[in-house]
Structures are given as C-alpha cells and as structure tokens.
Amino acid sequence: MITIKTVNTKKELTQFVDFLYDLFDGNPNFVPPLFQDECNCLDKSKNAAFDFCQAEYFLAYNDEGKIVGRVAAIINNKANQRWQQKRVRFGWFDFVDDREVSTKLLQAVEDYGRKNGMEEIVGPLGFTDLDKEGMLTEGFDQLGTMMTSYGAPYYKEHMHAMEGYTVDVRYRETKLMAPKEVPAKYMKVGEMVQKRYNLHVYKPSRWDLIVKGVGRQVFELLNETYKDIYGYNELNSKQINQYIAQYIPFVNPKFITIIRDHNTPEKKMVGFGLSIASLSHALQKTRKGRLLPFGWWHIVKTLFISKKSPIIDLLLIGVLPEYRSKGANALLFTDLIPQYISYGCVWAETQVQLEDNANATSQWGPLDPIVHKRRECYVKTL
C-alpha cells in the first residue's frame, strides 16, 4: 500500500530533492540539477515567487517506508489572474513504475487544488515560466540540459492512462548544428536591418549586466516578449534580482547579444539572445548535484577555464513583436554564431518551445534544425 505524506521538515525537503538523483542514478542522459538551487526554489522563505504563489510538497512511501515518488502542488495566483483561470499546477513529479504511486500523488495535488478553490489541475509546471516545464515524451536517449527535466518512458504511459487527463500543450526541443560560417541568409538579412532600420548589436560586459542595470533591462524585455506565451506571468522586481544573481555571473559575455534601435534617443533594447556553455557533463560529475567536494571545479572549468564547448545551451531569446518582422532575430545570430564557432561548438540546444509557436520554430531554418525531444503538459477538470 502506498502512503502519501506532506513535506513538513528540512530533512523531508532534502529527501524530496534527493529522490530524483536516486531514481535516475547511473542513467547516462540524466543531468542532475544543482541541489542548492532546487532547495532554494522550493524554500518559501527564499523563492521570490512565493510573493504570489502557494505550494505544498508530497512524498509517496511504500510498505517498507521507502520513498517511491514525489510531487509539488503549486498555485500561481498571479498567472491565474492573468489568464482568468483557477488552476493548481503539479511539478517535480517523479515516481517509480507503479500506477498506484503516480495516481495517489496526483490525487494529493487534486485535493490540494479543490481545497483552495481551484477548478483545474495542469502540469508538469513550476512556479514560473523559467522553471522546468513539460513531461519528456520523446528523446530519452538524448542528453538532458540543466534547464529541463528528465523522465522515464513510463511517465507518459502513466499520464495517458490517468483518468480525466488530456494533453494541454506540446513542446519541442531542437538541436541546431553549428555551421562553419554564418549562413548567407542571416548575413543578408542582418546587413539589411542595420542599414534599413538602424538596428545594431550591443555586447554588454558582465559589469554592464550586473552593476549598470543592463541585466535588469534584459529581464524587463523578457516580460514584454514572453507575455502572451502559454501560462506566462511577468517577473517582479524581486524575482528579476534573483535571476540576475543566479545566472548572470556565470554567463560568458561573448554569449550575450543585445539588439538596440539607434533610431530612438536612448538606443532602445529591442531584442536579446542569452546562451551558455552546456553544463550537462559538468553537472553529471557532481555528487547528487552538490558543489562539494569537487562539483564546483567541473562547473568552473566549463564556464571560465575551457576555451572549447562542443554544446551550447540557448537559454533565452526574445525580440519585441514589432521588430521580429524586421529581421532582428537574424541580426542576433550573425553575432552569436561566430562566437559559437570560435568555441568549437558542434551543436546548440534550444530550450522548450511550444509546438504552435511559429515565431520560435521558424527562425532556425538555416541551421539544419533537428527536433530531438518532445514534451507534453496535461490538464484535468477538477
């Protein structure tokens, strides 16, 4: 018999996080998240999303008292208000191949939602759009990334057999093969937008990003460019500060490109591309996502010492809608691609993108895109 218990103590929260490492221990494609990042994200006193979110975490135990599953129940009041919905989200959903485990975990989230007046359950989703989204349904033989969750093939089987659940949205992840030079199409469009629209590349330093407020401008632009994407809610000032502190110090400025409109007095920021040398292999060398004793070295080596990176993760790309048709995206790539080539990039990896987001999927054409992973989010009426 499976028993579901609420996470109430720091020890139980550690067990909640550690379950994932144990479940996929030895899997060559599983990329462990950083332990402390996971704990901070789930900690109600540390994650700024709790200014407008509420959550409860559950663990599943078998008869021997062994943990066999976990799930988070999240209510994002800000997103519900923005999209005029009453949804409870489920996330951090991992379990052994036992239908009783997965069913009872989701029932716990459903009960939590009903108790709080929710009308639907949806997931896997996190607190915000920058958390991990979607359940992996294809690409189990592909290396994961630090920004996405892994999963077993039986996860999808459980969800598709679960009573009342249907697919809400589908995502894709794409592998972009690195060219030997910038594709002619990008070069042609990039030159045109500079001459015709007076749009130009700006390369910020880490000082600019952290101290001069350019990093904040990037996330404010993210809010504007992502505002109509499925389930998105704007990041508040406190969240932006957290993301700047969490990500910007570790990003190579060469992999950050900003597009500015020189027709405006302030040279308005209208687009950005933020990427990073893949940390997948470095994270796999940590002990359960811990930086100590030697996990930190593998990450530092990848980010700051090595001059080669065969895989680049495209973390975030955003262009204001009125500038997409002008070719601003192509201008981004004319700057970023030479940087990737100089680091020996073999391919770049996109993060999750909605299958019906034509603006996101159409821009990769000249880079021989290969869709190598797919994900799904599910919804059920309570």
Model-inferred region functions:
Residues 366, 371-377:
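A structural motif corresponding to the C-terminal lobe/cap of the Radical SAM core domain
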Residues 20-63, 71-81, 203-317:
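A conserved beta-strand-loop-helix scaffold within acyl/acetyltransferase catalytic domains
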Residues 122, 175, 258, 274, ...:
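Short beta-strand segments
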Residues 2-3:
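Extreme N-terminal starter segment of soluble prokaryotic enzymes
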Residues 80-164, 289-366:
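Acyl-donor binding region in acyl/amide transferases
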Residues 149-229:
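Acyltransferase donor/substrate-recognition loop-hinge adjacent to the catalytic core
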